[in-house]
Amino acid sequence: MSDMAERLALHEFTENAYLNYSMYVIMDRALPFIGDGLKPVQRRIVYAMSELGLNASAKFKKSARTVGDVLGKYHPHGDSACYEAMVLMAQPFSYRYPLVDGQGNWGAPDDPKSFAAMRYTESRLSKYSELLLSELGQGTADWVPNFDGTLQEPKMLPARLPNILLNGTTGIAVGMATDIPPHNLREVAQAAIALIDQPKTTLDQLLDIVQGPDYPTEAEIITSRAEIRKIYENGRGSVRMRAVWKKEDGAVVISALPHQVSGARVLEQIAAQMRNKKLPMVDDLRDESDHENPTRLVIVPRSNRVDMDQVMNHLFATTDLEKSYRINLNMIGLDGRPAVKNLLEILSEWLVFRRDTVRRRLNYRLEKVLKRLHILEGLLVAFLNIDEVIEIIRNEDEPKPALMSRFGLTETQAEAILELKLRHLAKLEEMKIRGEQSELEKERDQLQGILASERKMNNLLKKELQADAQAYGDDRRSPLQEREEAKAMSEHDMLPSEPVTIVLSQMGWVRSAKGHDIDAPGLNYKAGDSFKAAVKGKSNQPVVFVDSTGRSYAIDPITLPSARGQGEPLTGKLTLPPGATVDHMLMESDDQKLLMASDAGYGFVCTFNDLVARNRAGKALITLPENAHVMPPVVIEDASDMLLAITQAGRMLMFPVSDLPQLSKGKGNKIINIPSAEAARGEDGLAQLYVLPPQSTLTIHVGKRKIKLRPEELQKVTGERGRRGTLMRGLQRIDRVEIDSPRRASSGDSEE
């Protein structure tokens, strides 16, 4: 083995190699520098374009020319990656304040990567790039050798505004990433000025000025102020953006989409839901975007009755019409280390950078002024002694030392005198020199005054920030509008709300008819079959069936066959226990209270929603004692209503319905006491249940007789829940009861 070879453990070599690569990616590729807000490739593109003379007023040049210069001189990487970085800086929908002014196809909001090849597009720097470049040749930047040591490039650009916040950036390094959102130039400049005026400004005071991110789109930022504050306090978090829409001629028109969201992609997402019958209330989609309206997506509902606010809320939850953006304010600070910083730290550190840049610029200018004044002093000496100077120049072999010794000049002054042209020896030149000297002396005093006074330095910083904010600033584009979180609609919510009548036959066949004006008994039934029950409701309400074992089932009316046919057997849609039959059917609002009871005399109160079970096997709703049956469910209109229970033997008991417990399932509590021996022999049992308002009058039908019971007479049957009840004379076999209520005039008969 050669003596030149170095022996190194593999783990040590790989560890060092990976660490070096990681540091390179972090420091020299993925993360921006706080001073100018640029990654190295962006900085090199901007600098190379300025070196090519491609300023905002220059003629456009082929982008390939710029990319070639960047790769050949400063950035030895792939041309496609370099060009893509350049494209991003030119896209007004990607960058809040583009650095490159492009001509040709530079991509579209719908497809940012649809840009033409670099041999076709042309580019130059935008006016905004002056904020990064205008002070470059004024001693403000540190210079470093390029990759092959043949050229010098700036280590950072002397940004006049906090570009790190204005344009933001994203990048993935090794073990860390950055996601800095763009901000409004005027807001950030104003915040920086506030920090100069009052270095102890708090984060809350800054957030009164900087409202939040400002993306290059008119879509709304819907994140709450409290969450935005937390993001700027910790340097991490996320914001949500939501599309802007309005109603126009019954349709929804979307006029602004979240940042980097494609309108075509959104339409695809909505169309996919329509194909899958997830949006039955939407009839049509159109993209009417053009040059005048860059974003105009139209959603047409099926009818004017559709609640488009609810539909849009669903679309916000299920499509890119609402999008979340990660924020991670990770950047390379002035100390050369990557760190996540909060808003106060970013602006404070940038002001340190800016103050240093301005100080360097002023010192550079002061040095130039002092050099020129020094030369002007020498020239004045020459003009005052012009004849002697000419004689020395004509007669001396070495005129420079002679001039220096005769007039006490420095080498620089003597050199300047010797370089004077004869025409500059005119009398008027002396006046010009004295005028220039006077102006430069004023400038020198001014520069020295600023450099010596912190107050004057602060005033200069503020004045420059204000001037740049006025020249380059614009109004906020992304409004902040705090909104509630969007929720996707359930399948139940999506169903159209139309009146329907559900019809059940004796043999358990079911069908759905549109409308409520249906003659259910007069419909066509199978041979040997006939009408059993009908309920009216809306097509987006579930219809509930209760079987003879006390189980409940729910079906959406939209899944039922049309009433034009004879329907379908319920057993094809539900799995009933062996021997069970469907006894009751009902449709109510979700929170409607119902009385569920068995003829054994037990019952409880529940809501309609407690009955809903969308699985085929249903749910155990009411627990039945042996040989007991389910009573028809009774609607409870008001908590103050009374419950009237009537047994087969004619015993009556009335008590407040509120005495019964509210359960979601179970046996319930005893309504009326029925002796077990009589119940077993079938001699007695709960026969009828009525819920009636207080002060109701009853008309009881016994055979052909009608007996009226007024409120005061009903007091005789009022008692505690669970008692035996009262057997009133002549009322042993009650056929039916009519309720005459001061509040409700309709019949209280609950049977189907």
From Swiss-Prot:
Residues 31-494 form the Topo IIA-type catalytic domain. The record marks 39, 75, 77 as: Interaction with DNA. Residues 497-752 are annotated as: Sufficient for MukB binding. One of its GO terms (biological process) is DNA topological change. The active site is at 120 (o-(5'-phospho-dna)-tyrosine intermediate). The record marks 119 as: Transition state stabilizer. It is found in: Cell membrane. GO terms for molecular function: ATP binding; DNA binding; DNA topoisomerase type II (double strand cut, ATP-hydrolyzing) activity. The keyword DNA-binding applies. Topoisomerase IV is essential for chromosome segregation; it is the principal protein responsible for decatenating newly replicated chromosomes. It relaxes supercoiled DNA. MukB stimulates the relaxation activity of topoisomerase IV and also has a modest effect on decatenation. Keywords: Cell membrane, DNA-binding, Isomerase, Membrane, Topoisomerase. Its EC number is 5.6.2.2. It comes from Escherichia coli (strain K12). Heterotetramer composed of ParC and ParE. Interacts with MukB. It is a peripheral membrane protein. PANTHER family: DNA GYRASE/TOPOISOMERASE SUBUNIT A, DNA TOPOISOMERASE 4 SUBUNIT A. It catalyses: ATP-dependent breakage, passage and rejoining of double-stranded DNA. Residues 472-492, 718-752 are annotated as: Disordered. GO terms for cellular component: chromosome; cytoplasm; cytosol; DNA topoisomerase type II (double strand cut, ATP-hydrolyzing) complex; extrinsic component of plasma membrane. Belongs to the type II topoisomerase GyrA/ParC subunit family. ParC type 1 subfamily. It holds the Pfam family DNA_topoisoIV. Inhibited by quinolones. This is DNA topoisomerase 4 subunit A.
